[in-house]
């Protein structure tokens, strides 16, 4: 069983993280480990009709963001890596500065030190120079910066289509193949 850590921070776009967990429920060889910041819990209730319990039930394992002794806080606990979807600027800053005041940033720090993939789906706009510098620093220490920017070549017809394309592309970063892609991949013109 392969393990993937799914972090959800307080940035707008909680539905992306929810959809990722929904999709991974059907991938039998992936065990999901969910950690949500306190702000994510608030954003979830503001932006979606999902309850915290419903989202937690989508994950195989749920960790309290305050539990610094959780399995995912150690490099000896093997994972494929971690995605934070969405990733707030606060969380990005904590990761860049190794300020591991909770499990979300601690798990990300561990993934980086173990040289495993860390995908940060930074959700903020517009960006000022400080934000851009943080993203540059994160990339320099090994993170993949992957803002949830929609593509239009597959001609999305709904918000779900936009979300699905981002989720599928995130899974590509971990070489997780779905039985059927969630969007039409570019085949050339």
Curated annotation (Swiss-Prot):
UniProt-listed Gene3D superfamilies: Flavin prenyltransferase-like
Positions contributing to dimethylallyl phosphate binding: 153, 169
UniProt-listed Pfam families: Flavoprotein (PF02441)
BP term (GO), one: ubiquinone biosynthetic process
Source superkingdom: Bacteria
GO terms of molecular function: carboxy-lyase activity; flavin prenyltransferase activity
Entry keyword set: Flavoprotein, FMN, Prenyltransferase, Transferase
Induction: During aerobic growth, expression depends on the carbon source, with the highest expression on succinate, a median expression on glycerol, and the lowest on glucose. During anaerobic growth, glucose does not inhibit expression.
Family: Belongs to the UbiX/PAD1 family.
Protein name: Flavin prenyltransferase UbiX
């Amino acid at each position: 069983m392969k393990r993937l850590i799914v972090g959800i921070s307080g940035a707008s776009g909680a539905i992306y993280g929810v959809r990722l967990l929904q999709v991974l429920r059907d991938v039998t060889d992936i065990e999901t480990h969910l950690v949500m910041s306190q702000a994510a819990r608030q954003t979830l209730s503001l932006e979606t009709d999902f309850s915290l319990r419903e989202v937690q039930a989508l994950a195989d394992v749920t960790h309290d963001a305050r539990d610094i002794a959780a399995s995912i806080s150690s490099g000896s606990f093997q994972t494929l890596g971690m995605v934070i979807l969405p990733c707030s600027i606060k969380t990005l800053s904590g990761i860049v500065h190794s300020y591991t005041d909770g499990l979300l940033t601690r798990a990300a720090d561990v993934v980086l030190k173990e040289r495993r993939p860390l995908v940060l789906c930074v959700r903020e706009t517009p960006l000022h120079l400080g934000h851009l510098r943080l993203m540059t620093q994160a990339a320099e220490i090994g993170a993949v910066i992957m803002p949830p920017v929609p593509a239009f070549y597959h001609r999305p017809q709904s918000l779900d289509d936009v979300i699905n394309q981002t989720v599928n592309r995130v899974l590509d970063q971990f070489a997780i193949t779905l039985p059927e892609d969630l969007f039409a991949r570019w085949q050339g013109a």
